[in-house]
Design a protein with these regions (language model features):
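Kelch-like beta-propeller repeat domains
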Residues: 1-200
Length: 200
């Protein structure tokens, strides 16, 4: 994901033999990778969302949900255990910390985005039984807690999510039950509700 630090990118990866805590950052300007401090809790199928350096909580990367077990190469791998854990990376301090509160819904393969005011929105994903979720949660760093918002119209996992120019949140495609979808939805942040958008 873009961290807006010299147009760098960060990623978390599996070493092919199991879970790893390694976090690498790619410096676009130099064309080089380098390591930063590792994630506190190794897991796969997590989502990342970053805040802009100039924002209220600038220079943070959220590592959201994920799974502790199963086959990270398979969307429906057996033995997977979803988690509600959320960790936050401080870019300036090169340090990972827990948010202090887990999400109310453990999930993997979810969508996660941050808005200009530094707040985190998490939606969808799947639980430990590979059931797709509609649930949406909101994290406000000022109080350090999650709160539930209106659920998506349809549950989905492993989908694209982004913030539109007007601040609304859009989700695109993903997996619904046992099939993939091209459907899209938009969350009206001010109105607090979802609506269907044209399919991709």
């Amino acid at each position: 994901i873009a961290m807006d630090r010299k147009k760098n990118r960060s990623e978390m990866k599996s070493n092919g033999k199991g879970l790893t805590q390694v976090v690498d950052v790619y410096d676009v300007g130099k064309g080089e990778w380098y390591n930063v401090n590792p994630l506190r809790t190794p897991r796969h199928s997590l989502s990342l969302a970053a805040t802009a350096l100039g924002g209220r909580n600038g220079g943070q990367v959220f590592a959201v949900g994920g799974s502790f077990g199963g086959n990270q190469q398979s969307v429906s791998g057996s033995g997977r255990r979803a988690t509600g854990l959320v960790e936050v990376y401080d870019v300036k301090q090169d340090r990972w910390e827990s948010t202090g509160h887990d999400m109310s819904t453990p999930r993997m393969g979810c969508g996660a985005v941050t808005t200009e005011d530094g707040c985190l929105y998490v939606m969808g994903g799947s639980n430990s039984l590979s059931k797709t979720l509609r649930a949406m949660e909101f994290y406000d760093g000022r109080i350090g807690r999650f709160s539930n918002l209106a659920p998506m119209i349809k549950g989905r996992s492993y989908f694209g999510a982004g913030v539109l120019p007007n601040g609304d949140v859009m989700v695109v495609g993903g997996k619904q039950s046992q099939s993939w979808t091209t459907s899209c939805e938009i969350f009206d942040v001010k109105g607090g509700r979802w609506r269907t958008a044209a399919s991709c």
